[in-house]
Amino acid sequence: MLKPLGDRVVVRFEEEKEQTVGGFVLAGNHKESTRKATVVAVSETGMRTITGEVVPPSVTVGQMVLVEDGQVLEVTHEDEKLAIIREADIIAILG
């Protein structure tokens, strides 16, 4: 299993389904600026402030989150597609 460092979180994105009508992809279909994901691993240390104080992670393994589609490092680990993101790129915890 990947062990993220610092303020990083490992997530598994939900499969994106293309919108279709009668089997055809709709014209103008664009990617959303956010994506749903499940938290797979969280850094044990969390983020450090400018004064050196440790801020523990706000999310836990298994939570469903909404991620801003920006600085995402997608990796394949043990035949599984995962992504490493900064906790700051998580904009909401779902459910």
UniProtKB/Swiss-Prot annotation:
SUPFAM superfamilies: GroES-like (SSF50129). The keyword Glycosyltransferase does not apply. GO terms for molecular function: ATP binding; metal ion binding; protein folding chaperone; protein-folding chaperone binding; unfolded protein binding. It is found in: Cytoplasm. GO terms for cellular component: cytoplasm. Keywords: Chaperone, Cytoplasm. Its main location: cytoplasm. Gene3D superfamilies: GroES chaperonin. GO terms for biological process: chaperone cofactor-dependent protein refolding. SMART domains: Cpn10. InterPro entries: Chaperonin_GroES (IPR020818), Chaperonin_GroES_sf (IPR037124), Chaprnonin_Cpn10_CS (IPR018369), GroES-like_sf (IPR011032). Together with the chaperonin GroEL, plays an essential role in assisting protein folding. The GroEL-GroES system forms a nano-cage that allows encapsulation of the non-native substrate proteins and provides a physical environment optimized to promote and accelerate protein folding. GroES binds to the apical surface of the GroEL ring, thereby capping the opening of the GroEL channel. Belongs to the GroES chaperonin family. PANTHER family: 10 KDA HEAT SHOCK PROTEIN, CO-CHAPERONIN GROES. NCBIfam families: PRK00364.1-4. Heptamer of 7 subunits arranged in a ring. Interacts with the chaperonin GroEL. This is Co-chaperonin GroES. It comes from Streptococcus uberis (strain ATCC BAA-854 / 0140J). The gene is groES.
